[in-house]
Amino acid sequence: MPFAAALSTHPVTAHATGEVVGQILDRLGRHPDLAVLFVTRPHLGALEDAAGTVRQLLEPSVLIGCGAESVAGNGHEVEEAPAVTLWAGVFGPVAPIRLWSEGTEDESGRQQIEGWPSSTAFTAQALLLLADPYSFPIDGFLRELGGYQPGLRVLGGMASAGQGPGANRLALDDRVFTGGAIGALIGPGIVLETVVSQGCRPIGRPLVVTKAERNVIYELAGEPALERLLEMARNGMPDRDVQLINQGLHVGLVLDEHKVDFGRGDFLIRNVLGADRTNGAMAVGELVDVGTTVQFHVRDAASADEDLRELLALRHADGALLFTCNGRGTRLFDQPDHDAGVVRDLLGDPPLAGFFAAGELGPVGTRNFLHGFTASVALFRDSK
């Protein structure tokens, strides 16, 4: 198998790094094409040393990594405690990438992003991206990328160890950065599948937006948006769903209007930010056009579990990277190790590493998005 992963909870960074590197060497050997390293906050100050050890002993072609609030490895999750997790794979061409923004804007008011390579030695099928949420304009980057690299899938997450500007750490080969974004372009030598589990279930029925402005929905199917929601609640909605609405309502936006029936993976889930009782308008966390089909959604542990299991069912992976939300884990589920455990149980325990992100990256339909409360999974399968 061309993949290996290891997890250590030793509190001393040098010891923990030695443990995970040793396990990778035993299972995979030296010179992997890609190594991915995640460390929790107690190890954050020593990320440069940890990355240096990985490079010296493992000698990967490309190394990427970051600090995180919590991490995952091989079916287990370590939340807010010392941990180092390392993943490596031998699967073909990989190219490192470093992106940043100086804060300058172009004529259209968009922040200019520097660092995208003018060419690569191969045609990339995906980008694994780790970014600093305080300094990198991720939404703008994803929109731009869709224009000049259509079809390139982006998976990854926003670094979560830092609690303010300049506090995060991103590792790329022999350098560590406090801002911007780093990543790896994945070439054609491997089969790569993406799973984006947004953890919600629909309530009511799909409705067409008939009046909207930017991120405010005024009317659904000719009636005030809030009135449509209240109408559903009054007409036989289960008490549990009413409780979940009060805890946090979401809206799913259909991305492919050519479909007749909508199911999991057809909606981009966004939070409902608030409502105006005077006119029935609702503000949501995404720009919405008139004519868009939407459906209200709710989220709880049961729906998040069901969604992830259904999306992973009947899939296969030789290796996996997990980018889950720092609002999941035991903050959402009653038992520890949920997301990593589901991947292990359904996919036959592939070598897995990951981290709890401050925003997860993954495609829905043909476009890449920044998500929240999501589990975004990269599934690698040997093409031979």
Predicted stretch roles:
Residues 1-34, 39-55, 60-62, 66-320, ...:
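Small-residue-enriched flexible segments
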